[in-house]
Amino acid sequence: MKHNDIKDLLSRPEEYFCKDVTVCGWIRSYRDSKNMAFIALNDGTTLPHLQVVIDKSVIPEMPDGATRVGSSVKIEGMAVKSLNANQAIEVNAKTVTLLGDCPLDYPIQKAKTSLDYLRTLPHLRVRTNTFNAIFRVRSKLSFAIHRFFQERGYLYVHTPIITGSDCEGAGKIFKVTTIGYDPKYKSEAEYNADDFFGQSAGLTVSGQLEGEVMATAFGKIYTFGPTFRAENSNTTRHAAEFWQIEPEVAFAEIDDIIEIATEFIKYIINAVLNECPDEINLFDKFYEKGLREKLKKVVDDEFARVDYTEAIEILKKSGKDFVYPVEWGCDLQTEHERYLTDVVYNRPVFVVNYPKDLKSFYMKQNPDGKTVAATDLLVPGVGEIIGCSEREADTEKLLQAIKDRGMKMSDYQNYLDLRKYGTVPHSGFGLGLERILMYATGMGNIRDTIIFPRAKDELR
């Protein structure tokens, strides 16, 4: 049916004053008085609602159900200047048509409902202001990511979802099979040989290895797609399925990729600030006071940089009684990351030169033989959002790293060939979309940044 988008009315009110319009949407609230009634209507095109005025001398009786929160309606009327200071335009209704009734047991009628409760209703929570705003920001953020790379000449590539190798070498892979359990198979090798691919297969944990293939032909590429990790991590920062951005750049060393990552983060955060003002206002008011200023600091301030070894010394001298003890060689936990970002630096910080045993096999070894040219970008309130590294270009060192981790050499032969035929220094990083979305919105749980979150014992 033909109708006007509420976004158009609210953003360009002068074009619609004293004109007949038709709007469709869902009732967010209904207020009644003796002679007048007021509907807050939202059609999903924008976060703010449109006020519709019902003059009871014009519409003496509303259709049954057309006053209930959640019901969908079509309203025809005239757009006029609003007396409401918060909105320039409103609609004086001439007719109201019920499109879809919403019964009284609608579970999200209350204006304020806890996030914990809404997580039990993933199919309905997107209708609330909070989740409407989250996924609007997610959309803008996604397009800003593409825009950043496209403006700089990167090739967008699609990497496989089903893979035969574990990019991270950690064994946290969801297996893909067409057989299921069958006691006739006496070994894993026999089972895999009879399966669809004739070998073990799983969902991708990263598109990086394939991304490196493309970077050796096109120079600058990026991937942006779903990633899967079978990690039994029931935390507010981990999900089994998430979207990841992974650029790969030929002829780039670690300092080059840090510079690219810095420019990238500033660009996409600035896009959110400029393109989502209503949404940021909502998050600033209800979820993280000072959010807008925090994001402006990201855009305007320099990022800090600290060597892993120095970071360990800072943590050891802090006097803090950390749950996880701090020693050189330990993996930084959330409490350590938050202390560095929130207390020591009060801004994003790159921690560089991690111990090689903490990082993936493909990262370039530093001359000291103990650390790798790798860095994590930590941000206040969230912790790690980006992992960067220069890739190991030395075939012998790469072979040894694969052996040391007990990985199957044949799975990585194509990857090793990249070093054999015209290898170059190259680097890349990975950013989880949901992590940066948490940071940009002030959300404290990654499950609130995904429409249908996937985690341990959670598949709705």
Question: Which sequence ranges carry the predicted segments?
Answer:
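Class II aminoacyl-tRNA synthetase-like tRNA-binding/catalytic domains
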Residues: 2-246, 250
